[in-house]
Each structure stands twice: as structure tokens, then as C-alpha cells.
């Protein structure tokens, strides 16, 4: 038993899979480098086409992350929304079904009255003690993005299995120029996604749980 994402570990895969959720406010408890290293090592077990493993992790913690957070907050105060290396697609560019899911999420935020609070914690990088910024070379195969998604998902699952919470978010990478300066990320690489890691706090934002589509709308069988 135990409480998900707050230090307890699990061996049951179904429990890990169904209990993991996005943590939007982390506690002040630090995460050791050994745990972070093991999380990345485990994530590397994700499947990769022809074993390309076209990914790299820049892990920001302590003073470096504090400086990045301060710059993000300063830019937010100026109204600078930034733009990630992969851009920000407009909602209308997504399918009708995806737009329905997005609307449901925004309705949930509105119903809970936490929209403004959520924007604030995003600017603070969710108060995470560690953020993994995941990159791959510019011009890499589109298949490599699929691999990187698997790597990211595996990272979040193994983090939860080790008692940590996580969230993968666009807002973590919306100021790539700041990240390149502090983490020495070359211009030849795209900063694809960030994954915040840490221990879950008691904040009510962490009680937000989205629903998943019914399987009958997701899968089509041949008869």
C-alpha cells in the first residue's frame, strides 16, 4: 500500500500504471542524484527503432534550476510566453476528438477554480527539485520522436515506482534560449520536452485527475 508518489515504492505494474498522474506542485524534499541517475537508466530501457536511442537528458537541479526558475518567472511577469523549439500548435490544429479532450480538461480546471493558480505554478516549474530536459538532434527522423515519447513515458513510470511524482510539460521548455545558456545545450539539438521530478506535495492541484477515453473509441478490431 502507501500513497502514490510520496516516497513509497511499488512492485505491481498495474498499480503503477493506474496510479501515476501529473504532479503540479512538488514538495521541498530534494531528490538524490543517485535516484535521478537510476531513473534515467531505467528510462533507457524504452524500445527504440534499430536501437537508435536518439535522446539525451540534461538534468537541472539545485542552483542551476533555481536560476532557470528565476528567469522563467521574470519572463512571465513581462508577459513573455516564449516559444519551444517544437512550437506551440493551436488547438484548432488538433483532431475533433483531441479538442473534446482538451475542452474537458479546461472545464475541469474551471470547475475547480484553479486556473490562475495553475498558471503560477507552471511559471515556477511546478516547484520541482529536478527537471529532466530531453533533447534530440535537429532533423532527426520522425520515428525518433516516437522513441523519445516512449523514453519519457518510461521515465515517468519508473519515477513513480521509486516513490516520486512527475509531470511532462510544454511550459518547461518554452524558453529554450534560457535552457541553452544554463545547460550548454547545443543549437544542433531540439529541446523537445521537460519532465519535472520530485515528491508530491499536499497541494489541491495534485488532486486534479483527468479521465481517459473509453477503449471502444480507441481501438478498432477487424470484425
Where are these regions (language model features)?
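Short, Lys/Arg-enriched N-terminal segments with co-localized hydrophobic residues
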Residues: 1-10
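Solvent-exposed alpha-helices and their adjacent loops that cap or buttress functional pockets
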Residues: 49-52, 123-126, 185-187
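Glycine/small-residue-rich phosphate/adenosyl-binding loop
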Residues: 59-141
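Small-aliphatic-rich amphipathic alpha-helix that forms the alpha element of a beta-alpha
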Residues: 39-45, 130-182
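Short, surface-exposed beta-edge/turn micro-motifs
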Residues: 54-55, 128-131, 191-192
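C-terminal helix-cap and adjacent tail motif
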Residues: 15-19, 90-103, 190-223
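Short loop-to-beta-strand entry elements in the cores of soluble alpha/beta enzymes
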Residues: 50-61, 171
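Generic N-terminal amphipathic, Lys/Arg-enriched alpha-helix
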Residues: 14-29
Amino acid at each position: 500500500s502507501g500513497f502514490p508518489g510520496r516516497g513509497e515504492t511499488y512492485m505491481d505494474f498495474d498499480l503503477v500504471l493506474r496510479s501515476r498522474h501529473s504532479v503540479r506542485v512538488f514538495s521541498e524534499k530534494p531528490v538524490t542524484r543517485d535516484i535521478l541517475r537510476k531513473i534515467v537508466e531505467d528510462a533507457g530501457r524504452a524500445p527504440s527503432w534499430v536501437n537508435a536511442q536518439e535522446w539525451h537528458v540534461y538534468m537541472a537541479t539545485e542552483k542551476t534550476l533555481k536560476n532557470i526558475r528565476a528567469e522563467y518567472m521574470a519572463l512571465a511577469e513581462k508577459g513573455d510566453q516564449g516559444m519551444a523549439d517544437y512550437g506551440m500548435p493551436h488547438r484548432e490544429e488538433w483532431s475533433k476528438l483531441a479538442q473534446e479532450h482538451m475542452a474537458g480538461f479546461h472545464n475541469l480546471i474551471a470547475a475547480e477554480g484553479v486556473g490562475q493558480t495553475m498558471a503560477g505554478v507552471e511559471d515556477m516549474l511546478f516547484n520541482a527539485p529536478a527537471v529532466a530536459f530531453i533533447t534530440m538532434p535537429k532533423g532527426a527522423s520522425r520515428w525518433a520522436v516516437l522513441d523519445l515519447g516512449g523514453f519519457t513515458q518510461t521515465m515517468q513510470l519508473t519515477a513513480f515506482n521509486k516513490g516520486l511524482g512527475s509531470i511532462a510539460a510544454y511550459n518547461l521548455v518554452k524558453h529554450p534560449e534560457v535552457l541553452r545558456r544554463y545547460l550548454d545545450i547545443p543549437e544542433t539539438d531540439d529541446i523537445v520536452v521537460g519532465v519535472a521530478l520530485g515528491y508530491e506535495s499536499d497541494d489541491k492541484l495534485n488532486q486534479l485527475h483527468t479521465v481517459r477515453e473509453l477503449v471502444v473509441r480507441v481501438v478498432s478490431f477487424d470484425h
